Structure formats: structure tokens, C-alpha cells
Amino acid sequence: MEKHSLKEIIGLLKDRKISEKELLQHYFSRIDKFNPSLNALVSLRSIDEVLKDLENLKGCSVQKKTKSLFGIPLAVKDLIDVKGLPTTYGVPKYKNNVAKKNSIIVDRLIDSGALIIGKTNTPEWGLGSHTFNRAFGATANPYDVSKTAGGSSGGAAASIAADLIPIADGSDMMGSCRNPAAYCNLYGFRPTPGLIPEERSKTRHKKLPILSTLGALAKTPEDLAYFLDIVSGSHKSDPFSF
């Protein structure tokens, strides 16, 4: 499984060569084995919690074929709100800053059938070309744990490269998706600001020009395109979205 792209994994699920539960167990097994040395994922949920989400997803009336990420486990950069999980920004005083609702991108991922398992590590406030902070510590490179995974989406990059998750969101102002992707032998994409909507009322980016934008990291360009098709598009909370 660990060598497969997101699109290949989705194909295996559709062909029933692997079940959603088996996929989840596979990734949690790798997380248990490799995340202690990588420190790529933080604020992790338990597998039992995520399995309950999967059962609820299977019980809903919407057909699987309409859910483009059905049963895919994902983690979200620790600058982005996931209801019930802390958004720490890598800052110790925010370790108990539990989000009361999802960000727009998280709602779109969940609506597509994704299972949110936790957060990906980031430098404090997402500022830096290397991923380390006082809240959780440094993220290591899966190819050599004595080396950096880059930043600021270093937790996302290390998680994909180590096959802890198949794809991830990121954010990018001056290379924060592209830098860690290069460090971890992946593809990172910084889209035009507004392609992936954000709640601008929560950010300082209320006026043009907007420098920082949400983006994505993946094993293949095809995976990037697939992910962007899901999370992009206009939203009433973002006047610059399209």
C-alpha cells in the first residue's frame, strides 16, 4: 500500500481489493511505527474514534460513488480548524485551543468522505522553512531522520513521504508547500489565492494583495489535481474566492 498514489488507493477501494477499515488500520500501523521518530503528525485521534466516523459514513444515505474521498484518512495542517481538535499554530499557549467548527477546506474534505485523523506539524504560526516549534518539537525527514523535512508544511510532507497519509493540504506564502515537497521528494503546489477559499474574517488577508494561500502536497501531479478539484471553488465567506 505504501507505494501507491491516492488515485491508485481509490481504485483499490472501488475494486474492493482492500476495505476502508483495512486501509485505516494500515495507516495507523505505520503511524504507530514511524511517527514517534518523525513527529510529523500531532493531535492524533485514536483509531477507534476514526472507525466510528467510518461507520457513520457507511450508514449515511449518500452513495459511495458520490464521495470522491470516501474512507481516505487525512490530517490537516495545524493552522487550520478541525472541530474538536486543537489548533495550536505550533505555539504552546494554544495547545488547548480546541476549534468549535471546521474551516471551509475541512468541511469540503469531510463532505467528500475523508476521515480526519489529526493534524500535521508546522513551525510556530506557520512561519519558517523548517518545521520545529515549542509545542510539539521538530519534524524529521523520512529519508534521513537527522535531516529537516522543510517547512512550513513539513509535517504534511513527511507524513506523505513516510506513507502515514496519502495526500495533504498545506499553505504557502514563500514556498511553504513547495519547499517541504522538494525536501521529501513530493509535489507541492501553491495555487492562485482564492482558488481554495478561506474565511477571510479570521485572517489578516482581508485586502489584496493576498500573499498566503492554501495549497496541497502529493506523490503525483494527478493526485494534486484530484485534491484541488475537491477543495477549490467559490464560497460566500471568501470574497476573493472563485
Regions found by a protein language model. Give the residues of each.
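An N-terminal boundary/leader segment
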Residues: M1-K52
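Enzymes and membrane/adaptor proteins characterized by extended Gly/Ser/Thr/Asp/Glu-rich
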Residues: F34, S68-I105
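Short pre-catalytic strand/loop immediately N-terminal to key active-site residues, enriched for Gly-Thr
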Residues: P92-K100, G137-S152, S212
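Gly/Ser-rich catalytic serine loop of serine hydrolases
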Residues: V98, V145-A157, S171-S176, P180-A181, ...
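Nucleotide-cofactor and metal-assisted catalytic machinery
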Residues: L109
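Paired acidic/hydrophobic, glycine-rich loop segments that form the ligand-binding mouth/hinge
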Residues: I117, P166-G170
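Alpha-helix C-terminal capping segments
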Residues: A157-I167
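A short helix-breaking turn/cap at a secondary-structure junction
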Residues: R190-F242
